[in-house]
């Protein structure tokens, strides 16, 4: 588990989920450190689902978006992760940010947007069952 004033990340074994919760706005190292810790958990627990609670979300600075697209997403793909879930309210103040990330993430991952952890998990499990 990782926890800072900006984020909390944990592996939930029963669900095979790396759960990343943003607590408040973070940029540069305060943003990247929790994301790297999530990545390490995803490397350790191959083929896990990645769920990001973005209800306390924020607009990323340009440098963090570039870092995410150029470093994080290619590394995430190597972990075997196939599903990325966003926990968000029906209407979010960061729609543009989520749309930007979703467009890039969907190139390699199934994106699920829902209002709860359980809703994402159910949808992810249904999708994986239907792919068999």
Question: Which functions belong to the PLM regions below?
Answer:
Residues 1-132:
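Amphipathic, Lys/Arg-enriched alpha-helical "gate/interface" segment within cytosolic domains
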